[in-house]
A protein has these predicted regions:
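Nucleotide-sugar donor-binding catalytic core of glycosyltransferases
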Residues: 1-117, 135-145
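Catalytic binding pocket for nucleotide-activated donors in carbohydrate/polymer assembly enzymes
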Residues: 97-174
Length: 174
């Protein structure tokens, strides 16, 4: 992986994530209602838009992170934030923990949030780490010029979370 040292003292592969994924029942209901009304509005005013995928990726993120945490073959450093944590923790501490978490492990899980993209993907690359991109049909820049598979692990989101985790482990050990 392009000069990134993935060796560690542990026999397990270190993987990190820091971000929002822990939703309360109220958060899930709010997200469902927003998506429901968004889809109705788009069907009425923009019938040409294909919205086959969920508008929010938070449910996917939550399920995937649980699967990563439960896997005994990985040394996971996962900090799951609640939506309102940013108002409870100082901005400096919040950012420090986020950046430190990416630097802690050679691999960082990058799965979409509310949009079909991951800013964490670019931040991980900028910090010299390897992103594990869970691909939900997102478009990467310059994909006709850059072989992204040389710089990151890209796993299609077309199966169960446990199988995605297994695919990540196979890709790392290949």
């Amino acid at each position: 992986f392009c000069g990134v040292n993935i060796a560690s003292d542990s026999k397990k592969t270190r993987i990190s994530f820091c971000g929002t994924a822990n939703w309360t029942l109220l958060d899930k209901c709010e997200s469902f209602l927003k998506e429901f009304f968004f889809r109705i509005k788009n069907r009425a005013f923009r019938p040409y838009l294909d919205l086959g995928f969920p508008v929010s990726g938070m449910n996917l993120r939550e399920k995937l992170l649980k699967s990563f945490k439960q896997n005994k073959n990985l040394d996971t450093h996962i900090i799951i934030r609640k939506r309102r944590d940013s108002s409870l923790i100082s901005k400096e501490k919040y950012k420090f923990e986020y950046w430190n978490n990416i630097l802690l492990a050679p691999f960082t899980i990058c799965v979409r949030g509310n949009g079909n993209f991951s800013v964490r993907f670019y931040e991980t690359l900028a910090l010299g780490r390897i992103p594990i991109l869970i691909d939900t049909d997102c478009v990467l820049p310059l994909d006709n010029e850059i072989n992204w598979h040389k710089h990151c692990i890209i796993i299609k989101n077309n199966t169960k979370p446990n199988r995605i985790v297994d695919s990540v482990i196979l890709s790392i050990n290949a």
